[in-house]
């Protein structure tokens, strides 16, 4: 799909009027659309494909159809992805590796200015997915098995991360060594931030 460079489009649907409107077209593989958590006029989307070949994370303002690149790669084999919007809608957070499988960060880009902040973490703390608490004070991660991009041997944990300067301090919450990571845990916080919620198959086969 990535190599084909076929014409593609983003569109929105008015659920009250039942109308469809095209808002953006490109030959890139457009994918992973997410509305802002607070601004219904702002949509995040991605140029999908091999992460080391694409500047992946973009936004588009529906009222003007103006697009903005959220993170531009700065070195060979750099990857950024698994992006999500902060609860207040001001930041897009993502997994950043500079370069791939070598140096690991969780980074955030301001949706208005593009200014970035990033927190480093250890190889064994890298997670397939990260998420942010509703009060925006804590992060969580779902770990990974040795077959994932970090190739870590002791990363099969549900993690709680506390930002500390330019890095994360990690706390291990759940041992996932009996979980099969073909089912990605996809961590997130409960609305009151008292729980980290995740999927797991260590008690049996998932449906």
Where would I find each of the regions flagged by the language model?
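N-terminal leader/targeting helix
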Residues: 89-118
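Loop/turn-rich, solvent-exposed surfaces of beta-rich toroidal or solenoidal domains
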Residues: 100-104, 120-169
């Amino acid at each position: 799909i990535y190599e084909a460079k076929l014409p593609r489009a983003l569109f929105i649907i008015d659920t009250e009027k039942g109308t469809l409107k095209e808002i953006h077209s490109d030959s890139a593989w457009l994918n992973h659309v997410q509305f802002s958590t607070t601004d219904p006029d702002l949509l995040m989307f991605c140029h999908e494909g091999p992460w080391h070949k694409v500047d992946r994370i973009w936004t588009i303002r529906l009222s003007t159809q103006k697009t903005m690149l959220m993170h531009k790669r700065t070195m060979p084999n750099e990857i950024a992805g698994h992006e999500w919007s902060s609860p207040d809608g001001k930041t897009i957070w993502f997994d950043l590796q500079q370069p791939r499988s070598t140096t690991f960060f969780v980074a955030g880009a301001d949706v208005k200015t593009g200014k970035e902040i990033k927190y480093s973490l250890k190889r064994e703390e890298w997670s397939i997915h990260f998420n942010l608490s509703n009060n925006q004070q804590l992060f969580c991660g779902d770990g990974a098995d040795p077959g994932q991009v970090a190739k870590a041997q002791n990363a099969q944990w549900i993690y709680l991360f506390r930002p500390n300067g330019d890095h994360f301090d990690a706390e291990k919450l759940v041992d996932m060594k009996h979980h099969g990571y073909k089912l990605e845990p996809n961590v997130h916080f409960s609305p009151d931030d008292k729980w980290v919620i995740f999927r797991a198959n260590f008690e049996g086969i998932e449906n």
